[in-house]
Amino acid sequence: MSLYLKAEKIQSWRVLIMACAGFIFNTTEFVPVAMLSDIAQSFDMQTADTGLMMTVYAWTVLIMSLPAMLATGNMERKSLLIKLFIIFIVGHILLVIAWNFWILLLARMCIALAHSVFWSITASLVMRISPKHKKTQALGMLAIGTALATILGLPIGRIVGQLVGWRVTFGIIAVLALSIMFLIIRLLPNLPSKNAGSIASLPLLAKRPLLLWLYVTTAIVISAHFTAYTYIEPFMIDVGHLDPNFATAVLLVFGFSGIAASLLFNRLYRFAPTKFIVVSMSLLMFSLLLLLFSTEAIIAMFSLVFIWGIGISCIGLSLQMRVLKLAPDATDVATAIYSGIFNAGIGAGALFGNLATTYLGLNEIGYTGAALGLIGFIIFITTHLKYRHTFLLQNNKKITAL
């Protein structure tokens, strides 16, 4: 094997490790969705109230993403990753022993702190450590890792939770995180901070209208998705009258749709980025609008959830790629803001879902999400039409507004 091929193989393994890290972080963020009923029962709470643990997690990421990124902006990236995993593991140990819901929320906030920095640096890191001609594929690999969190993480987490308790699920995640941390120590090179940006980058980013409106669109569209997705488990059981095993299968289908979305993104996004986003948003709205009707037949729900998963996964990938394109001079800061806003959308969606469930009924979460999705869709189309011919100047380079 030539030195070039050997180096490329090592780089590919490094990307795979980061994809596994993404899998772990996404699994722990969303696995409560599959165990809300069990967690609520443990603390003698209403399921809708337990869903607020998603809100607290997401809003911790929102609040901490930018300040934490600025505080760690000059740190060598490998050592930073190791520190993040230590915080992540300690948070999960606290989750396992949580003796009341408030301790559980404290543990989730600890994990969210690690999350806020991890997702601020991961996309740009993956592109740095990947083979030169496989940058887009590397981002796609990271996306597959996050998609596997819903394919394997959520269903397996639910199964483990049902068999031996939700605490064991979080304990297993801690063990997996420890294994990945050792792989990072062993295989990742030292990675000095590069194009991370600083507090001085904020005024420059604030002068890029396409980027600012992209953040607004992200917050609203992600809120639309999580308005329904946060409560999909009780929706399927209480409204759809599905057996809990079928509910697990639906989550599995949602996860597989993420892999399909990653493949579509790798093949199609570069040819027509804006059309790709528009179609993806349309799929999301269509799915949420028809969510209640899909409960009439099992096959309808499986089909709709698959389409829904493709839509939201493509949205997440394409919006993140656009952020990187619009802020190549401050990738980590711009991504930190994106990550914070993305999680604000998760928290707001969980809250909207809670309000819809409480005041309108669980069967209305799809309509509520679709209404929010329409608002985000209109904002995206309007701002694209207004700014599609603009150019952003940074470091004497023209950055085409895609």
From Swiss-Prot:
CC per GO annotation: plasma membrane
Broad class of where this protein is predominantly found: membrane
Listed Gene3D superfamilies: MFS general substrate transporter like domains
Transmembrane stretches, start-end: 15-35, 51-71, 84-104, 109-129, 137-157, 168-188, 209-229, 245-265, 276-296, 297-317, 333-353, 365-385
GO molecular function: carbohydrate transmembrane transporter activity
Keywords per UniProt: Cell inner membrane, Cell membrane, Membrane, Sugar transport, Transmembrane, Transmembrane helix, Transport
InterPro entries linked: MFS, MFS_dom, MFS_Efflux_Transporters, MFS_trans_sf, Sugar_effux_transptr_put
Pfam families listed in its UniProt record: MFS_1
Membrane topology reported for the UniProt record: Multi-pass membrane protein
SUPFAM superfamilies assigned: MFS general substrate transporter
PROSITE patterns: MFS (PS50850)
Localization in the cell: Cell inner membrane
The family this protein is said to belong to: Belongs to the major facilitator superfamily. SotB (TC 2.A.1.2) family.
HAMAP family: MFS_SotB (MF_00517)
Role, per record: Involved in the efflux of sugars. The physiological role may be the reduction of the intracellular concentration of toxic sugars or sugar metabolites.
Name this polypeptide is given: Probable sugar efflux transporter
Species of origin: Haemophilus influenzae (strain 86-028NP)
